[in-house]
A protein has these predicted regions:
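A short glycine-rich, Lys/Arg-flanked "PGG" loop and its adjoining helix->strand segment in the class I
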Residues: 106-120
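Short amphipathic alpha-helix with an adjacent loop that forms part of the alpha/beta core around
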Residues: 85-87
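Local beta-strand N-terminus motif with an aromatic residue
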Residues: 35, 90-91, 117
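A conserved beta-strand element that flanks and buttresses the S-adenosyl-L-methionine
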Residues: 94
Length: 126
């Protein structure tokens, strides 16, 4: 995931300029269906993590990890292209507004599929 160095540079004001959009959050949560365990890849500050589920986050930027919102899921340092989890460890995996930053998006999506028990679902903001 190449966004680590980028967000270590520009992420200092991220929480001051970005807010969770309720419509987008609702679409993401609906797309997760009845998934109880969720991996959030390229998680940033955790603002789109669903409540009421067991979420674990992966984020490459130390600065973004340090700005996780109160109550956000535990977050590990890591890359989408090499997720440190066994096959089918989660009901679902999510990634919001991050894939375009990954060094190898195809590898990252394959990794998400590998660690998730169900096929991907997409939620696209309109």
């Amino acid at each position: 995931m190449s966004s680590g160095p980028l967000y270590d540079t520009i992420g200092a004001t991220y929480t001051l300029t970005r807010r969770t959009e309720p419509r987008i959050a609702a679409r993401i949560w609906a797309a997760l269906g009845d998934a109880r365990t969720v991996l959030n890849v390229g998680a940033g500050t955790g603002s789109y993590e669903p409540s009421g589920r067991h979420v674990l986050a992966v984020e490459p930027s130390a600065l973004m990890r340090s700005q996780r919102i109160p109550g956000a899921a535990p977050c590990l340092a890591g890359s989408a292209e090499n997720l440190p989890f066994d096959d089918q460890s989660f009901d679902a995996a999510m990634a919001f507004s991050t894939i375009h930053h990954w060094q190898d998006p195809i590898a990252g999506l394959r990794e998400m599929r590998r660690v998730a028990r169900r096929a991907e679902r997409g939620a696209r903001p309109e």
